């Protein structure tokens, strides 16, 4: 149901649907009698604090994922796929789910489907993993957001807000990565520090609003303090870059 590189700001929805559509029929055809679902939410990705001689002082999980509270659709798709003799068809399932669970119109269901079809990749050096420039990635997300925000669910409105939040977290991450790319570029000059700091301050301000939405939606699902910890880890890198830029700019 979930796997890397999924993160709080990235979900490869169609990869997970493809797993349901291909592996479950394979398992059934090869005599599987059941499956045990396990959870290793960090996928074993940790950061380490070392002493001399590479002695480990502490370990911190560094891969945080959006809670399963936002993935009821994927859970229901899994249940349907397990209980059907035919392979699940992702696009058909998603559109029917949109209409039945959220009360969306046919046009809204198509927009809902487009949400899941949008490619999501990690971004490094100003491009995503497929080589698409970050400016284009942001533009595509913003265009989807504009259309997606027009959807008005008639049912399960609280659950639906998870989709909006995940997209906003994605955009916030991409906007930060755009600033980071400029800072890490060989063309960067310290004279740009003030402008980048101003740009990043706005992004961090938006991240603070997203933090509040994340806590509101997940406070009853996560353990006390866990939502705040996930927020802090998600924002840590952008806050560190802001401090660096502020020092360089003399702010």
What is each residue range found by the language model?
Residues 1-251:
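Substrate-binding groove of N-acetylhexosamine-processing glycoside hydrolases
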């Amino acid at each position: 149901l979930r796997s890397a590189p999924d993160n709080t700001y990235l979900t490869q929805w169609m990869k997970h649907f493809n797993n349901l559509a291909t592996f479950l029929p394979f398992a059934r055809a090869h005599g599987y009698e059941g499956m045990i679902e396990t959870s290793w939410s960090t996928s074993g990705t940790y950061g380490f604090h070392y002493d001399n001689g590479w002695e480990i002082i502490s370990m911190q999980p560094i891969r945080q994922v959006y809670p399963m509270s936002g993935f009821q659709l994927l859970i229901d798709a899994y249940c349907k796929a397990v209980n059907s003799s035919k392979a699940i068809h992702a696009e058909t399932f998603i559109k029917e789910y949109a209409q039945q669970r959220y009360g969306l119109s046919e046009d809204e269901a198509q927009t809902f489907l487009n949400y899941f079809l949008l490619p999501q990749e990690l971004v490094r050096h100003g491009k995503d993993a497929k080589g698409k420039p970050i400016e284009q990635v942001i533009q595509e997300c913003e265009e989807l957001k504009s259309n997606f925000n027009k959807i008005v669910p008639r049912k399960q409105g609280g659950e639906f807000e998870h989709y909006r939040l995940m997209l906003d977290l994605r955009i916030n991450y991409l906007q930060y990565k755009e600033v980071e790319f400029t800072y890490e570029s060989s063309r960067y000059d310290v004279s740009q520090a003030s402008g980048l700091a101003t740009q990043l301050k706005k992004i961090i301000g938006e991240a603070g609003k997203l933090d509040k939405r994340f806590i509101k939606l997940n406070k009853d699902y996560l353990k006390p303090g866990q939502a705040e910890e996930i927020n802090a880890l998600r924002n840590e890198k952008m806050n560190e870059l802001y401090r660096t830029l502020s020092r360089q700019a003399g702010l």
